[in-house]
Amino acid sequence: MRLLLASSSPRRRELLTLLHRPFDCEVPEVEELRGANENAGDYVTRLAEEKAQTVAQRQQTPCLVIGSDTLISFKGQVLEKPESYEHFSQMMKQLSGQTHQVLTSVSVCQWNGHKVVARETALVTTQVEFAALSQGEIDAYWATGEPHDKAAGYGIQGYGGKFVKRIEGSYFAVVGLPLYETEQLLRMFEMTGEVDER
C-alpha cells in the first residue's frame, strides 16, 4: 500500500526518510485555527489528524497517510510563528532561562479509496530548557532568517540549537516528527499487511 506524508515541511520529509520506507509527499490544506476552549494537546492532535485526512481524501486508491503537527506551549500559552521582529523578540524573552513544552502529534490514517477505515495517533510532549539570552543574541538570531517560519521562532536543529541547555523527551519530536512513535504506528498497520515495504 502506498505511503504518503501530508506535509510541506522539508524537515519532516528528511526525518521520515530515516525510517527507510518509500513515500510520497503531498501538501495538506488545513486551516490552523485553535478553538476558543481547545487545549494545546487537543489542538495539535486535531491538526495532525486533519492533515492526514485531507490528503487521504484526494486519493483514488488505498493508501496510508501520515500527518504531523508541532506547537510550543509556555505556561499554558501557545507560541506561534513570529509575525514580526517584535513578536519574535517577545517570545525569546519569555523562553530565556525557562523550560517550555514542545507538543508534537503524529497521526496515521488508512484510506480505502473511499473513506478512512482506520486511524492511530500519538502525542509526544518534550520539555526544553533554554539558556538565558541577551538582547544581542536575540537580535543576531533574528538576522539569520531562521526564526521566520518556526513555531516560537526557533529551530533546535539549526542555529537555535545553541540556546537549548537540556531536553527531556524526543529530540525528533521537537524537530517535527517523532521517529519512535511514527515507526510504532506504521508497525501497527504492517501487522495487518497494510504497508508496502518495497
From Swiss-Prot:
Question: What CDD domains does this protein map onto?
Answer: Maf
The record ties this protein, via Pfam families, to:
Maf (PF02545)
Catalytic activity, EC = 3.6.1.9
Give any GO molecular function from the UniProt entry: dTTP diphosphatase activity
Instruction: Name its GO BP terms in alphabetical order.
Output: nucleotide metabolic process
Q: Where is this site: Important for substrate specificity?
A: R11, T70, Q157
- Family matches, as NCBIfam families: maf (TIGR00172)
General function of this protein: Nucleoside triphosphate pyrophosphatase that hydrolyzes dTTP and UTP. May have a dual role in cell division arrest and in preventing the incorporation of modified nucleotides into cellular nucleic acids.
Under the heading PANTHER family, the entry gives: BIFUNCTIONAL DTTP/UTP PYROPHOSPHATASE/METHYLTRANSFERASE PROTEIN-RELATED, BIFUNCTIONAL DTTP_UTP PYROPHOSPHATASE_METHYLTRANSFERASE PROTEIN-RELATED
Per the similarity annotation, which family is this?
Answer: Belongs to the Maf family. YhdE subfamily.
What is the protein name for this chain?
Answer: dTTP/UTP pyrophosphatase
The organism is Idiomarina loihiensis (strain ATCC BAA-735 / DSM 15497 / L2-TR)
